[in-house]
Amino acid sequence: AMSETFMKERPILPLLASMALPMVLSMLVNSLYNIVDSFFVAKISEEAMTALSLVYPVQNFINAVAIGFGVGVNAVIAIGLGAGDRRRADAAAAQGIALSALHGLILTAACIAIMPSFLARFTSDSAVIQMGLQYSGIAFSFSVIIMLGLSFEKLFQAVGRMKITMAALLAGCIANIILDPLLIFGPGPFPELGISGAALATGIGQVLTLAVYLAAYRLFPIPVRLRRSCLKPDGPLIRRLYAVGVPAILNLALPSLLISVLNGLLSVYSQSYVTILGIYYKLQTFLYLPASGVVQGLRPLIGYNYGAGEHGRVRQLYNATLCASGIIMALGTAVCLLWAEPLMSLFTDQPATVQAGGAALRIICGGFLISAVSVTSSGALEGLGRGSQSLVISLCRYAVVILPAAFLLCRAMGPNGVWHAFWITEVITAGAAFWVYRRTVKHPTQH
């Protein structure tokens, strides 16, 4: 077995890169699913694109539950392995996967049930509602597959097998890219399914990803084995899984909540603003992914070094991550300022929407650079096991500051107020994040 002391011995930058790159790639692939779907769905009609934008937050929520709970399972497995407690790691894996499947079943039923009334709250256009129901009905029935796939991803990550997760994700993503145009437009022998085809293509991609994981689990020996004997519910273990998982789920689910509230504010003015917000969120995932990948790489490193009492290294790691995410955000800002309209036109062919969207992007990107502070501080706190402090930062960013700001500015300036609320929120949150992080890390707690 490889010893984990490399976390405090290897030079900072190569170490951070080796941990972060696989994470960045896997997250990019995950968001590619959504981008590819949008690209082809935009070719159907503007209504189809609006339907996709309205369903997106709910889809995002399902992913948040899967990934957030996976983070909990991952942490408990990694800690068990680190302490040499194989049985605990095996139990965490088995019960984590069983609970994930259960989450999938509950979410499938709940989301399909709420969808008609959910869509009706945001639009009165029956074509949009019809398409939204078609898409979500198929997309949500793959929830169990998504949950299981993400549990296996976190299982392989916890034992350091990043290459397997890459292969599985790529297989699913490539299948989705190939199947999307075939099932949406139906060339040759393929059925023309329209927006349902997009949902089906994504589902088939997810099935393929899970299949690769199951095959890899059979073929490659990994230190964690799933055994039936480990399925006996273990109360304290399950509580531990949720203690790490629930704050992580909330961190990931808050943006969904925000998008839905903002959709409500914007739909008063026109449907095209809802589409612009949907497009912005798709572009934004691309920008924030490399940054949050670096931060994901930081998590285990900062926790390990903090535990080992290496406070100097904790500070170096934090600063290196802050610089790296700052550089990424600066590049993102430049791209948005230079190519706002071309980026928008990838997802809509309405000239008015492209113009308004370009203007929106240029306003919003003012907050990118400073947001590196909150992204880094939040990740560092999670790595130190301070989930609740990290949640405070996310709450500022996605609810406490931005909702009142968007509401007031929208009253004062119309839809542009919503775009200004974004950068104002980033500035305020960065200040709060820095303060929370300094207060938490200044006094190393005696263990």
Q: What residue spans do the PLM features occupy?
A:
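Hydrophobic transmembrane alpha-helices of multi-pass small-molecule transporters
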Residues: F61-A64, T108, N176-D180, L210-L214, ...
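Residue-level signal for short hydrophobic patches within transmembrane helices
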Residues: E9, L13-L32, V36, V58-V65, ...
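Small-residue-rich hydrophobic transmembrane alpha-helices
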Residues: M49-A109, A113, I146-G160, I164-T165, ...
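Interfacial/gating helices of multi-pass transporter permease domains
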Residues: F40-N60, S126-M131, I195-G197, L237-V244, ...
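Helix-terminus/linker motif at the lipid-water interface of multi-pass membrane proteins
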Residues: L28, L32-T50, L119-S126, L182-L193, ...
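Transmembrane helical elements of multi-pass membrane transporters/channels
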Residues: S18-D37, I138, G172, G205-T209, ...
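Short runs within selected transmembrane alpha-helices of multi-pass transporters and secretion channels
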Residues: G70, N74, A139-Q157, T165-C173, ...
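Short alpha-helical transmembrane segments in multi-pass integral membrane proteins
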Residues: A1-A20, I77-V144, F190-V246, I302-G367, ...
